[in-house]
Amino acid sequence: MKDKVRVAVVGGSGYTGGELLRILVTHPKTEISVITSREYAGKPVSLIHPNLRGLISLNFTNFSIDKISDKADAIFLALPHGVSLNYAPKLLDLGLTVVDLSADFRLKNPELYKIWYNYEHPYPDLLDKAVYGLPELHYEELKNAKLIASPGCNATATILALAPIVATKITDEKKFISDVKVGSSEGGAKPSEGSHHPERQNAIRPYEAEGHRHAAEAEQELSRIAKANISVSIVPHAVSSIRGALASAHTWLTNELEEIEIWKKIAEFYRGKRFIRIIRGNIHPYPDPKFVIGSNFADIGFAVEKRISRLTTFSAIDNLMKGAAGQAVQAFNISMGFNEDDGLKLVPLRPA
């Protein structure tokens, strides 16, 4: 292997692309060789990402598969849903490792793309080959993976909250509700009526409450763990913070367990997981996205309302890090045989 892996970031002008660059520019084993943007081709990267001044001297270029294959060993696709699938097959044929941050290869059942994304998937064979890039659940499969499907942020928060619950049979319930509060950066760099600052500030606004498409990912992964059909309703809420996502996942206890037993089961499930922190019994008793901002950590906690046997598990992440770019690099590291935390030894910001 070369001293450093040459990486390309396709779609490098958005928030997720910029976050990938922020991580990769200090990664000890990568060299950023190509950064593409159709809109800003020819312009300096630091013009669009001023936080990278003095760190990246490259200009954005137009995306060309043939040219990029000569300059890169691995490629991160930070593109809209339905776009990456047009490029991934040829990139794989050219021998590149592909990390796709869209939803195009996350779901194993091609029929689900008709339901949730309104298109028929043209490469169902690649869905079988793609590895869902949640390292806490797929670490071994990610080793030497060539096509990584990086999870969605709301799906990540929900799955991390519920995985230990279904895996360790803390409850026999098969239906869960995940209430996710998420910051405005989830909406991307291009403002819309819903993400425009005057409209978003001071808002707590539910959206896609009748069925959020990240539920398909959550059900797929949780059903696999539980070896049973799990149903998840994800109800996201847009809040006025810029970064961060908090999933509060609700269910009912069907088994008589003391809280210490629940804590032990969750802690054991996540034992040795580099970026999982279990939050319990301090002056900040529940996970809060404020304390993971800028990092790849996921803080996990829970609460039991004994009166009605309600169990709520919490998962706090930075939606641009563990919910997007950070997790993508974490999965990439594993696929390359690097240290899992290369480029990701980032301390959360405080205050944030």
Curated annotation (Swiss-Prot):
Gene3D superfamilies: Dihydrodipicolinate Reductase, domain 2, NAD(P)-binding Rossmann-like Domain. GO terms for molecular function: N-acetyl-gamma-aminoadipyl-phosphate reductase activity; N-acetyl-gamma-glutamyl-phosphate reductase activity; NAD binding; NADP+ binding. The keyword Heme does not apply. The active site is at 153. Coiled coil: none annotated. NADP(+) binds at residues 13-16, 319. One of its GO terms (cellular component) is cytoplasm. InterPro entries: AGPR_AS, AGPR_type-1, LysY, NAD(P)-bd_dom_sf, NAGSA_dehydrogenase, Semialdehyde_DH_NAD-bd. Its EC number is 1.2.1.103, 1.2.1.106. SUPFAM superfamilies: Glyceraldehyde-3-phosphate dehydrogenase-like, C-terminal domain (SSF55347), NAD(P)-binding Rossmann-fold domains (SSF51735). It is found in: Cytoplasm. Pathway: Amino-acid biosynthesis; L-lysine biosynthesis via AAA pathway; L-lysine from L-alpha-aminoadipate (Thermus route): step 3/5; Amino-acid biosynthesis; L-arginine biosynthesis. Signal peptide: none annotated. GO terms for biological process: arginine biosynthetic process via ornithine; L-arginine biosynthetic process; lysine biosynthetic process via aminoadipic acid. It catalyses: [amino-group carrier protein]-C-terminal-N-(1-carboxy-5-oxopentan-1-yl)-L-glutamine + phosphate + NADP(+) = [amino-group carrier protein]-C-terminal-N-(1-carboxy-5-phosphooxy-5-oxopentan-1-yl)-L-glutamine + NADPH + H(+); [amino-group carrier protein]-C-terminal-gamma-(L-glutamyl-5-semialdehyde)-L-glutamate + phosphate + NADP(+) = [amino-group carrier protein]-C-terminal-gamma-(5-phospho-L-glutamyl)-L-glutamate + NADPH + H(+). Keywords: Amino-acid biosynthesis, Arginine biosynthesis, Cytoplasm, Lysine biosynthesis, NADP, Oxidoreductase. Its main location: cytoplasm. Belongs to the NAGSA dehydrogenase family. Type 1 subfamily. LysY sub-subfamily. Involved in both the arginine and lysine biosynthetic pathways. NCBIfam families: argC (TIGR01850). This is [LysW]-L-2-aminoadipate/[LysW]-L-glutamate phosphate reductase. The lineage of its organism: Archaea, Thermoproteota, Thermoprotei, Sulfolobales, Sulfolobaceae.
